[in-house]
Amino acid sequence: MDVKKVVLAYSGGLDTSIILKWLIESYGCEVVAFSADLGQAEELDGLEAKALATGAVKARIVDLREEFVRDFVFPAFRANAIYEGQYLLGTSIARPLIAKAQIRIAEEEDADAVSHGATGKGNDQVRFELTYIALNPAIKIIAPWREWDLKSRSDLVEFARRHGIPIPVTKEKPYSSDRNMLHISYEGGILEDPWLEPDPAMFTLSVAPEEAPDAPEFVEIDFERGNPVAVNGERLSPAQLLTRLNALGGRHGIGRVDLVESRFVGMKSRGVYETPGGTIMRTAHHAVESVTMDRELMFLRDSLVPQYSRLIYNGFWYSPEMRLLQNTMDLAQENVYGTAKLKLYKGNCVVIGRRSDRSLYQPSFATFEEDDVYRQDDATGFIRLHGLRLQIESLVRGKSR
């Protein structure tokens, strides 16, 4: 494959630093190192200088934090997306944005190829490449882990030494991690034993629930059309709001999940996740929905959530079926305005109140006291009609005995 210039999704770790040098050596091409700022904090320090020192002709770090939360996290949370009942899709939802920005930079830099550092066994290779194909079918794709003959950690270290690529002198973590504004994930290494409890020192965004404050903290979150817009009455931008909720949740040990998930490529893998702000946001969203969404609308929407979540997990963010589902999910949120009040305490996020000017909860109908709006004897015919098919089935079954 003839390649003149490649835009590499560059994290600054040993793997993508080696890939940068390998691309130059294997393809004789120029490499532009692209890094997406999704809230990795200090992980971005020194990234540009490191990329240039490794051989990149240019290094670009793009702040995508607001776009990430506004256009990717919020749509997923409007839909109550969750994979296999536990995973809030923190890594999955970030990949299409990184790949989208990578394609944009490739077009700006007149590059004819893109490259990523995802392995041939994981989900990320699919997520990156499906986005590349959807947004620029003509772009060439280089996936080094599926091409090169570097098969082990020792092979990578030897390649780095041979090419003068700095190898971290700090003790290697016995697991891998991936961080953005929504979550941090941990997998591999010692976590591959699903019976082994994670090291408490591993966690970054949250304190252990048993070490959280002994007094609860209360928070109110306002929603408009299913989007959180304010915390305790203060309106915030999407990224600011998620940052605030991360701090609150982390302080109280909220949002830790240890699970085994089904990868798109076929195998199961263990993942440990911290999603403090997202957990609060999801709980509050459910609370406001409970008083503002029609029952049948909610049932229908809920039936679509598993498929919607699988599309995100499997990398089909830019597919026609995702556009259809997103439009449907957003239509279901037209009436979701209101405020949820939560109590945060030692790993627990508990709804203690909800209110809305558009509330479908009407005390005059729901009261257990005497009322003038609901005729209890109407229930007799209601029950008879709904029981008719059961009555017929029982009669037929009795005849067949």
From Swiss-Prot:
Catalysis performed (reactions): L-citrulline + L-aspartate + ATP = 2-(N(omega)-L-arginino)succinate + AMP + diphosphate + H(+)
Compartments in which it is found: Cytoplasm
Residues annotated as binding L-aspartate: 119, 123-124
Group of enzyme by EC: ligase
Record EC number: 6.3.4.5
GO molecular function, one term: ATP binding
Primary location recorded for the protein, binned into one broad class: cytoplasm
Pathway: Amino-acid biosynthesis; L-arginine biosynthesis; L-arginine from L-ornithine and carbamoyl phosphate: step 2/3
UniProt key word Nucleotidyltransferase: no
UniProt-listed Pfam families: Arginosuc_syn_C (PF20979), Arginosuc_synth (PF00764)
Binding site for L-citrulline: 87, 92, 123, 127, 176, 185, 261, 273
Chain segments annotated as coiled-coil in the UniProt record: none
SUPFAM superfamilies, sorted: Adenine nucleotide alpha hydrolases-like, Argininosuccinate synthetase, C-terminal domain
Record-linked InterPro entries: Arginosuc_syn_C (IPR048268), Arginosuc_syn_N (IPR048267), Arginosuc_synth (IPR001518), Arginosuc_synth_CS (IPR018223), Arginosuc_synth_type_1_subfam (IPR023434), AS_cat/multimer_dom_body (IPR024074), Rossmann-like_a/b/a_fold (IPR014729)
Annotated GO CC locations: cytoplasm
Binding site for ATP: 9-17, 36, 117
GO biological process, one term: urea cycle
Gene3D superfamilies: Argininosuccinate synthetase, chain A, domain 2, HUPs, Single helix bin
Keywords linked to the UniProt accession: Amino-acid biosynthesis, Arginine biosynthesis, ATP-binding, Cytoplasm, Ligase, Nucleotide-binding
Family: Belongs to the argininosuccinate synthase family. Type 1 subfamily.
Assembly: Homotetramer.
UniProt-recorded name of the protein: Argininosuccinate synthase
Organism, as annotated: Syntrophobacter fumaroxidans (strain DSM 10017 / MPOB)
